[in-house]
Amino acid sequence: MSQPRPGHRPDCNGADPDSNFASMTHSARPFTEVVIEADCWQAEASAEATVLRAIETAADAVDADTGGAELAVMLTDDDHIRQLNASFRGKDKPTNVLSFPAAQPEVQPDGAPRMLGDIAIAYQTVRREADDEGKPFDHHLSHLAVHGFLHLVGYDHETEEEAEEMEDAERAILARLGIPDPYAGQDRVS
């Protein structure tokens, strides 16, 4: 039996086939790499394209210098995101999306790309939430990719004011994607 590659996660049922490294985009927008780390994402053939489109639309919509920067989006499973959530946030439970903004050096080394950070999205939680809320999976995935991206460019929702600003940005970006307001009929939660 061969050893799994470092960083490779088995599929959501415990199998260990090769993971897929999705394609990247490059333009005035950030260079985005989507890594499909858990094979349960294979059930959603359009996941990579959905994430890339959401990130590109968000980058076009926000007032942030993202051109030439890089970010990675890891499509993972509940077990791995639970571990990340426990390690980085002290919450030992799965969540839908985590963002890890990159620390910016005072001086960028010549030729080195500027890193925006990383986003992790958990398949089972996203699927469960989409089903529970009666939303198309790709709409919910787009929302979470946008949410994660906004964290990378400085948005947050720690206060009511921040939450309102972030949700307004999400609504505007999702509207550009033809996705209905994900907060319609909900009480604001920061």
Swiss-Prot record:
This is Endoribonuclease YbeY. Residues 1-25 are annotated as: Disordered. The keyword Zinc applies. Belongs to the endoribonuclease YbeY family. Binds 1 zinc ion. It is found in: Cytoplasm. GO terms for biological process: rRNA processing. It comes from Rhodopseudomonas palustris (strain ATCC BAA-98 / CGA009). Zn(2+) binds at residues 147, 151, 157. GO terms for cellular component: cytoplasm. Pfam families: YbeY. It is an enzyme of class 3 (hydrolase). InterPro entries: MetalPrtase_cat_dom_sf_prd, YbeY, YbeY_CS. Its main location: cytoplasm. The keyword rRNA processing applies. Its cofactor is Zn(2+). GO terms for molecular function: metalloendopeptidase activity; RNA endonuclease activity; zinc ion binding. It comes from the Bacteria. Single strand-specific metallo-endoribonuclease involved in late-stage 70S ribosome quality control and in maturation of the 3' terminus of the 16S rRNA. HAMAP family: Endoribonucl_YbeY.
